[in-house]
From Swiss-Prot:
Residues in compartment: Cytoplasmic: 541-975
Encoding gene per record: csf1r1
Region (Regulatory juxtamembrane domain): 544-576
Name under which the protein is recorded: Macrophage colony-stimulating factor 1 receptor 1
Reported function: Tyrosine-protein kinase that acts as a cell-surface receptor for CSF1 and plays an essential role in the regulation of survival, proliferation and differentiation of hematopoietic precursor cells, especially mononuclear phagocytes, such as macrophages and monocytes. Plays an important role in innate immunity and in inflammatory processes. Plays an important role in the regulation of osteoclast proliferation and differentiation, the regulation of bone resorption, and is required for normal bone development.
Chain sites annotated for binding ATP: L590, G591, A592, G593, A594, F595, G596, K597, V598, K619
GO cellular component: CSF1-CSF1R complex; plasma membrane; receptor complex
Membrane topology listed for this record: Single-pass type I membrane protein
Disulfide-bonded cysteines: C49-C93, C140-C189, C236-C292, C426-C495
The organism of origin for this protein: Takifugu rubripes
Length: 975
């Protein structure tokens, strides 16, 4: 047979010298007559191909080519001793040397039967990733020709999506046409062998959605200004749903440009590229447009900016006035009582470091990098406000000023006085300078200027108007003298003064009236009326002065829907809280309000150990406080003593009520209020959460320095740093203080980085504190991050600053009626119905959660408290999820913001939910910032429970039995 084949091929070659034929395929030495052959398990596979010229095989898998060999003549052989199901497929033979005969091919489909595998699938093809709209062939190759009903279904047993269109090919697999994102799922190929369904391995199909929009491209500034020789750095922020996009720059600059890209993946469906263009030293020729361009398969998007290069620093000032005043330039004339807005547009580089108006009115300024708009609002102007208004601006390298000259139109005022028996003088004030005209008429008349009297009138233009006095800013005084002629009749003389603004007149009766002292009496009555009005106004302003009101309320009893609140002034005061004044050393002021302040102090002998020293906070009144404020401070003292001790409220330690002003001694919280703490830690927190690589390179920009300066807000209560590592709220020997004082301040927990667990702990601790207040029948009414303090071990404690906050100057407190209220933190029933309950505290707690997980942002950002705000709250508007809130935390927020108070969770429920997020451990076990010093750990003292100072009220057994809490479903306080 082997010798016969070359002879046969030679005959075929000579016979086909005129016309070539399709190649011939032999399967196991037999000419293939059909399109399919079957290889039984355990047998070999041999395929030969021959033709009129050199031939070659095309196999399904490239690796099968290693089984090929060339035989004598124009023969090509594939020989596999023990083929597996992998060799199932279509084998195609073609002419390899003659391009004009490539179309002459022969093929055969080989089934390699495998009783254990009806389908052969490649492991590399099981995970399918394709773009939307593409076709894809699932390589489900049947190894058994007897298999029937080849099909496709989902791996979970359900049918394919109804919109999926596919075609079955027994020799190739299943072709899915026009892939869609809705096809994303796991699929299997199915077939029946002797009535039994067989399935292939699972194919996981992931269709990448076709991009429909170009990349997002953003440049921070519309214009950049630089001085010759300065460095320019422009950041272009871009993002795209996938990796298939690029960022380029278009610029006309002449200087050398370097471009750096920072790539970051934000989840599966977003790639961020920050492209940074840098010119180390700009030149005047670099002035021009610069564009950042992002390109993907959907198109192109760009953002443009302009570079202006100047030779030297500059400050340019232009006036900005409303259109009707713009033509007046810098000299502005307005009517009395009108509003005036003076505006200045400032262009400066480098940016201004200081700006001010030379006027007592507060300015408002909005600014970009080098363009500013400063405006001065003058409401209902009066004569005293006219004058020169100068705006000053300066930078490190330049300064400038611009002045407006504001003059006010004033209606003239005419006054006639009798100089002698024949002479009258009329004096008038106004701006512009008034003109004076005299009239006289017979009889006693209210006016001579008009025909309504029916009497003859005489005009005397010969009485000239003379300017007496002119001020630079103010009314012009003019005067006119009129000589009265002799007459036997009573006569009325009228002086009329007029200018562009208005007219004023005054009359004089030449013959003396019989009613003596009438003018005097009228004048006295007028003065008395003005005095009474002034007195009423001063009394009203006195009543409007801010009064301190303690926010916390204690419920005494409940009868049906009627609730009785305890008058805090009627609460008893336990004398055991008294502490000697001479053992209290006052320090710096930590916070101040309108009538009170909080100072840091050192207490000697406070507690059971009479030799210890303790840092405390002392609340006291200012010298200008009224009796109402003194009574309110005593009420606060009584409420704190009534509540008792809890780890998550600022506890009362003592008081001084005799021999001087009232002093309330409380725990000292060295890390200040939670709001400022979150804002101070925000930058490092974001860097840690986002895992930005640059944080290690630029760590000096973010880490806390031991001697860093902390700023004290007027409304923040207690916020300070300390040069001592004093144990927080624990008695300590002076020697221990000195030893620990030598420790690095960086060991303080205030310098530790902030993480998500810290935010969860703060949330849990505040909820536990509020749960304690609720159990003591106490409504807080001002739950907010500014009213939560942190100890140096990061334990959150609830407080109420009250006297120590200046709510008149705190933007968080909005005027509503006759009070200033924290509207953005208040529940709807508190805003609209003046109803305060534990449930309204729950609403406020939801706002506090939002503050915590937004790292100290103001709630309802960029939303003014106006009618639109009230409508949105009433309709159930809820803030979106904060940047760093877990979904479970945001769910708690939304539960707290339920419009129906009874549907809101209790603080106990909230504590349980947050505790589960922390791992279900007891809060005391969760606290990693334990209240111990490093020295104690070394000495083996860390395992001892620190002694707690028990307040006198706890030792006095005032509360022999815990009463059933009165707070049930709805406890209302009606205003």
């Amino acid at each position: 047979m082997q010798s016969f084949l070359p002879l046969l091929m030679g005959i075929m070659a000579s016979a086909s010298s005129v016309e070539w034929r399709h190649p011939v395929i032999w399967f196991n030495s037999k000419v293939v007559q059909s399109s399919e052959v079957v290889v039984k398990p355990g047998t070999s596979l041999e395929l030969k191909c021959g033709g009129d010229g050199p031939v070659n095989w095309q196999t399904r898998l490239p690796k099968h080519k290693r089984y090929m060999s060339r035989s004598p003549g124009n023969l090509r052989t594939i020989r596999v001793a023990r083929p597996t199901a992998e060799f199932t497929g279509t084998y195609k033979c073609f002419y390899s040397a003659w391009a004009q005969h490539r179309h002459l091919t022969s093929s055969v489909h080989v089934y390699v039967k495998d009783p254990n595998r009806v389908f052969w699938t490649s492991s590399t093809s099981l995970r399918v990733v394709r773009k939307e709209g593409e076709d894809y062939l699932l390589p489900c190759l049947l190894t058994d020709p007897e298999a029937t009903d080849l099909g496709l279904r989902m791996d979970n047993g359900t049918t394919v999506p109804p919109e999926m269109n596919y075609t079955v090919y027994r020799h190739r697999g299943i072709l899915i046409r026009s892939l869609q994102p809705s096809f994303n799922a796991d699929y299997v190929c199915t077939a029946k062998v002797k009535g039994v369904e067989k399935t292939s391995k699972t194919f996981s199909i992931n269709v990448i959605q076709k991009l429909r929009f170009p990349p997002y491209v953003f440049l921070e500034m519309d214009e950049y200004v630089r001085i010759v020789g300065e460095e320019l750095q422009i950041r272009c922020m871009t993002h795209n749903p996938n990796f298939n996009y690029n960022v380029t720059w278009n610029y006309t600059t002449k200087s050398r440009v370097t471009i750096e890209e920072r790539v970051r993946s934000s989840g599966e469906n977003r790639l961020d590229i920050q492209s940074i263009l840098t010119i180390s030293a700009v030149d005047l020729a670099d002035t021009g447009n610069i564009s950042c361009i992002g390109t993907n398969e959907a198109g192109v998007n760009s953002s443009n900016t302009y570079l202006l290069v100047v030779e030297k620093p500059y400050i340019r000032l232009w006036p900005q006035l409303i259109p009707k005043l713009a033509s007046q330039g810098l000299s502005v004339e307005v009517n009395e009582g009108e509003d005036l807005e003076l505006g200045v547009m400032v262009e400066a580089y480098p940016q201004i470091t200081d700006h001010r108006w030379h006027t007592p009115t507060s300015p408002s300024t909005s600014m970009q990098e080098h363009i500013y708009h400063a405006r001065l609002q003058l409401k209902r102007m009066n004569a005293q406000e006219q004058g020169q208004y100068t705006f000053y601006a300066k930078s490190n390298l330049a300064n400038g000023s611009i002045s407006f000259h504001v003059k006010m139109y004033q209606k003239p005022i005419a006054v006639v006085r009798w100089e002698n028996i024949t002479t009258l003088t009329c004096t008038s004030f106004g701006y512009p300078a008034p003109q004076i005209i005299w009239y006289q008429c017979s009889g006693i008349r209210p006016t001579c200027n008009g025909n309504n009297t029916g009497l003859p009138k005489q005009n005397h233009p010969q009485a000239l108007t003379v300017e007496v006095q002119r001020e630079e800013y103010g009314a012009v005084e003019v005067e006119s003298v009129f000589t009265v002629g002799l007459s036997n009749h009573r006569m009325t003389v009228e002086c009329v003064a007029f200018n562009l603004v208005g007219v004023s007149s005054d009359t004089f009766t030449v013959e003396v009236s019989d009613k003596l002292f009438t003018s005097t009496l009228i004048g006295a009555a007028g003065v008395l009326a003005i005095f009474l009005l002034l007195l009423v106004f001063l009394l009203y302003k006195y009543k409007q002065k801010p009064r301190f009101e303690i926010r916390w309320k204690i419920i005494e009893a409940r009868e049906g829907n009627n609730y009785t609140f305890i008058d805090p002034t009627q609460l008893p005061y336990n004398e055991k809280w008294e502490f000697p004044r001479d053992k209290l050393k006052l320090g710096k002021v930590l916070g101040a309000g309108a009538f009170g302040k909080v100072v840091e102090a050192t207490a000697f002998g406070l507690g059971e150990d009479k030799d210890n020293t303790l840092r405390v906070a002392v609340k006291m009144l200012k010298a200008n406080a009224h009796s109402d404020e003194r009574e309110a401070l005593m009420s606060e003292l009584k409420i704190l003593s009534h509540l008792g001790h809890h780890q998550n409220i600022v506890n009362l330690l003592g008081a001084c009520t005799y021999g001087g002003p009232v002093l309330v001694i409380t725990e000292y919280c060295s890390l200040g209020d939670l709001l400022n703490f979150l804002r101070q830690k925000a930058e490092t927190f974001v860097n840690l959460v986002m895992n930005i690589p640059e944080i290690m390179e630029n760590s000096n920009d973010y880490k806390n320095i031991c001697n860093q300066k902390w700023y004290i807000r007027s409304d923040s209560g207690i916020s300070s740093t300390s040069s001592s590592t004093y144990l927080e709220m624990r008695p300590s020997q002076q020697s221990h203080i000195e030893a620990s004082g030598r420790k690095s301040l960086c060991e303080d927990n205030g310098d530790w980085p902030l993480d998500i667990d810290d935010l969860l702990r703060f949330s849990l601790q505040v909820a536990q504190g509020l749960d304690f207040l609720a159990s003591r029948n106490c409504i807080h009414r001002d739950v907010a991050a500014r009213n939560v303090l942190l100890t140096d071990k990061r334990v959150a404690k609830i407080c109420d600053f009250g006297l120590a906050r200046d709510i008149m100057n705190d933007s968080n407190y909005v005027v509503k009626g006759n009070a200033r209220l924290p509207v953005k933190w208040m529940a709807p029933e508190s805003i609209f119905d003046c109803v305060y309950t534990v449930q309204s505290d729950v609403w406020s707690y939801g706002i506090l959660l939002w503050e915590i997980f937004s790292l100290g942002k103001s709630p309802y950002p960029s939303m003014a408290v106006d009618s639109r705000f009230y409508k949105m709250v009433k309709r159930g508007y809820q803030m979106s999820q904060p940047d760093f809130a877990l979904p479970e935390i945001y769910m708690i927020m939304k539960m707290c913001w339920n419009l129906e108070p009874t549907e809101r969770p209790t603080f106990s429920m909230i504590s349980q939910m947050i505790n589960r997020l922390l791992g279900g451990q007891d809060e005391q076990e969760k606290l990693i910032y334990r209240n111990v010093q490093p020295e104690q750990v070394a000495e083996g003292e860390a395992c001892d429970e620190p002694k707690r100072y028990d307040p006198p009220c706890e030792r006095s057994c005032d509360h022999e039995e815990e009463e059933e809490p009165l707070m049930k479903t709805n406890n209302y306080q009606f205003c």
